UniProtKB/Swiss-Prot annotation:
GO CC terms, sorted: plasma membrane
GO process annotations (BP): monoatomic ion transport
Alphabetical list of Pfam families matching this protein: MatE (PF01554)
Membrane-crossing residue ranges in chain numbering: 15-34, 47-69, 89-111, 132-154, 164-186, 193-215, 248-270, 283-302, 317-339, 388-410, 420-442
Keywords of this entry: Antiport, Cell membrane, Ion transport, Membrane, Transmembrane, Transmembrane helix, Transport
Recorded GO MF terms: antiporter activity; xenobiotic transmembrane transporter activity
Family indicated by similarity: Belongs to the multi antimicrobial extrusion (MATE) (TC 2.A.66.1) family.
Function: Multidrug efflux pump.
Encoding gene, per UniProt annotation: norM
Subcellular location: Cell membrane
Protein name: Probable multidrug resistance protein NorM
Bilayer topology: Multi-pass membrane protein
High-level lineage: Bacteria, Bacillati, Bacillota, Bacilli, Bacillales
Statement: the UniProt record of this protein carries the keyword Transmembrane: yes
């Protein structure tokens, strides 16, 4: 990151931040995407099992990685304020937190996964695949969480191209292992959805190893000497980190877990409905990688400018990110409307699943505008380290408005499973409105401070 003077310079620098992040997020998502699509071609039962397992795993992983994402705004503001010497301590303490969080998640999972699955009254093969999927994914928790911290450090320096290269190097491993283990090719055992979990876990370890090597040997990362001193765990540092990270993590958890909760509540419907819902939701999540990537770029850019006390520049980066997100949303809405048949065909050859997935995809169009506002706005707020109000707004919009409304529509109207999608759309719209108002308030506060000084 460097200081910019004109709007065109900001747009160029933002694009240089965004594009590698986008490729990275798409590559990471591709692991889940290939898990889902390839499992679906194994059988509808494998697809449903992976859907249930993923719906339990994703909220946990995204919530905790959200906490660890606090590394990015903290390091970005330190670099912006010329405090490079403080960066290694922050990163190492975050790594310690990542490892501790990993063991806590694994321990909790040992006692809760089986009761949760038993309580869902799934078909026996679906429950078995989901349980095995989660057991294997647990082995990849430590590398995934640790990588999240190290990636936050790399991205905060504006070197998002590096994380892009790391992920692109790892993606083929995931795809090849999926091909071998899901379908049993070249003499490997045919494991179906369980093979997808093994492939993803192995890939997480590869990503971590590559990242550690790059940070230790390549500039500008090596000059920070991140691994030179293994600092003692500092509870005061953990407290400061968690003060920022916990609201970020819970906001992300509330947002992602509502989709997972809907998938779990879909267990009352048929396996065909679960599979179709998962296919449509998976593609909607694929499109979500764009506003998410814009949000991550905004956190870096806004955090850097706030650290340097250039508040007007931070405000301009916010508008750039939201404007780009809305443009992409329009493009994706057109894509969903005209190519719903082709998109559904990616996930399944089953006629019933295909038809129902097309119906769900139409609702995904309405997600686009709300996501284009809510997600980038949260990224900008993280750059300001303003996270507590966003947490409350997200909780209300998704869990107080969206999910209860979806349940009512699904249970007491003819909308059935589609009622959940309508509830989500309304909740997302409220969330986007609340968050945008908060961003304007924060920008006004910092602009006023800047004018007074």
């Amino acid at each position: 990151m460097k200081e910019t003077n004109s709007f065109s310079q900001k747009l160029k620098q933002f694009a240089l931040l965004f594009f590698p992040i986008f490729v990275t997020q798409m590559s990471l998502f591709a692991m889940s995407f290939f898990d889902t699509t390839m499992s679906g071609h194994a059988s509808p039962i494998d697809l449903a099992g992976v859907a249930i397992g993923t719906s339990i795993w994703i909220p946990v992983s995204t919530g905790l990685t959200g906490i660890l994402m606090a590394t990015t705004p903290i390091v970005a503001q330190l670099v912006g304020s010329k405090k490079k010497e403080d960066v290694p301590h922050v990163v190492i303490q975050a790594v310690y937190l990542a490892i501790c969080a990993s063991f806590v998640v694994i321990l909790i999972g040992l006692f809760t996964v089986t009761p949760i699955l038993n309580g869902m009254r799934l078909e026996e093969p679906v429950e078995r695949i989901a349980a095995q999927f989660l057991s294997i994914i647990a082995i990849g928790i430590i590398p995934l969480f640790t990588y999240t911290v190290l990636r936050g450090f790399i991205d905060a320096l504006g070197k998002t191209r590096t994380t892009m290269i790391i992920t692109l190097l790892s993606l083929p491993i995931n795809v090849i292992l999926n091909y071998l283990l899901i379908f049993g090719n070249f003499g490997f055992p045919k494991l179906g959805g369980v093979g997808a979990a093994i492939a993803s876990t192995a890939t997480y370890w590869c990503i971590l190893i590559i990242t550690v090597i790059i940070i230790h040997t390549k500039e500008p990362f090596a000059s920070f000497n991140i691994f030179k001193h293994l600092y003692r765990p500092s509870l005061s540092s953990w407290k400061a980190f968690l003060k920022l990270g916990v609201p970020i993590g819970f906001a992300i958890f509330f947002e992602t877990s509502i989709f997972a909760a809907v998938t779990l509540m879909m267990s009352n419907f048929s396996t065909t409905t679960i599979a179709a819902h998962q296919a449509a939701m998976n593609f909607a999540s694929l499109l979500y990688m764009t506003p998410l990537s814009l949000a991550m770029a905004m956190t870096i850019a806004v955090g850097f400018e706030v650290g340097a006390k250039r508040y007007n520049n931070a405000k301009q980066y916010g508008f750039i990110g939201i404007g780009l997100a809305l443009a992409f949303a329009l493009l994706y809405s057109i894509l969903l409307y005209f190519f719903d048949n082709e998109i559904a065909s990616i996930y399944t050859t089953d006629i019933q699943v295909h038809h129902l997935a097309k119906e769900f995809l139409i609702f995904a169009i309405l997600f686009q505008i709300s996501d284009a506002i809510a997600t980038p706005v949260q990224g900008a707020l993280r750059g300001y380290k303003d996270v507590n109000v966003a947490l409350i707004m997200t909780l209300i919009a998704y869990w107080v408005i969206g999910l209860p409304l979806g349940y009512i529509l699904a249970t007491y109207t003819d909308w059935a499973a589609k009622g959940y999608w309508i509830g989500l759309i309304i909740g997302l719209a409220f969330g986007a409105t609340f968050l945008l108002i908060r961003l304007f308030q924060v920008q006004r506060k910092y602009t006023t401070q800047n004018n007074r000084s």
